[in-house]
């Protein structure tokens, strides 16, 4: 369904707003259910515009997420793109090779302009990178000046691909280099046209982005490539019926065939530069490995989509696929985990982290977390009995009366759960991955080690002298440099937090876990209060923090 807000209006180039009056074929403010064809037509009625008005914007209310169409020219003619002569006349060097794939600190300076931008557009513009040590995707918001110009600096640790987003749903990838400078003239209307189902068939109005500077030719190839070979790995493009009820072996064969077909298409197309082909090959390697590693979750998703059952019931009925002993031999076959070339891709760190959680057959002592917890002398007799009862209920397929209590024990014995998880990861790395690669050395294993220290810092735990002694043993100085900076920032944050004022610590005293919330709020009985619970790793929590700032000021 769609819905047109009754607060919609037209903003004309004379500065006046013309509020919507009514809809013909649609009722304003109510859900309009789309037919199965996905196509429908209706009219929106606005006041008569003065004859002097040439350009309008359609604005569906003033909220950030509301739909907007900017720069509608009433005569149907678009003005010429305002490109500088330097951009028009420049000659790009498509023979330029990719820079060396290595760990190298530096900032990439990004400058440019959003073509056709008006100051009231207020389009969000950002750059997304994947941090190599935390494996977190981080967004850098880019300030756009009233004339559409912008400048930002992106911290990098290697030449790599990043993703830019402009507006609501428009994304494009860019290759950046530490120490490099890249200028981008972003053609807003062509980016919009190329994403529109209705306008895709119309003639392009120039390039989506015009590049000059570091690796400009490669970025030009990336932005003008309409074959989109990597779409084969995008879940939105998958035919889930192909995957529905597949065995793990069929799933593996299916994607390895796609991988070889894509690889062949990349290598055979000599129109692309060698640099671009090498980048595409690296992306193909990465995305195939990610897709194969996510066999269980992807087959579960296909089952939910195609089974015809309600989602919750489908997930409950889905049976985890049986993995053969040689299922993961694609690790040896593709042989990319240790390759520095993976640094070119925007997601290698995500792969490195995810490989530590593969579903594999464990040794007996690592196959039962309950047995591990119960074997610890840190667990009290009373808690051990609850854990046994919970396990018995779970094994019998029953909903345990101790489910809520088990959640509390999960938090209480968090260190034991983390220890067990760490032991499982070590088994996967040393027995499975190292077995297929024939080594425990290399970039992949270095990152696995260093990610543990980065996670410690992310958990607000400063590194110890012993930690730094271990980090200094690494052959690449990047790790010591980066983790030292991360640790210093954490120490500065901790000290700054100690000096903060303007808040009151609400002492709850010694209370049971289930009584904590009541203890916090009981002192304010009869008053309206805002209680903000959040977690640093939680995406929705982070979004809510921004939304709640005005409430906290009130």
What are these regions (language model features)?
Residues 195-526:
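Oxidative protein folding and maturation machinery
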Residues 49-67, 162-167:
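Short, surface-exposed ligand- or partner-binding patches at beta-edge/loop junctions that are enriched
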Residues 525, 533-550:
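Conserved redox-active cysteine motifs that mediate thiol-disulfide chemistry
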Residues 552-554:
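Thiol-based oxidoreductase modules, predominantly thioredoxin-like and allied folds used
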Residues 2-24, 64-73:
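Solvent-exposed beta-hairpin/edge-strand motifs
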Residues 69-102, 485-507, 517:
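Pro/Ala/Gly-rich low-complexity, hydrophilic intrinsically disordered segments
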Residues 73-274:
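A non-transmembrane, solvent-exposed segment enriched in polar/low-complexity residues
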Residues 21-55:
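Short, solvent-exposed, Trp/other aromatic-anchored flexible loops in extracytoplasmic proteins
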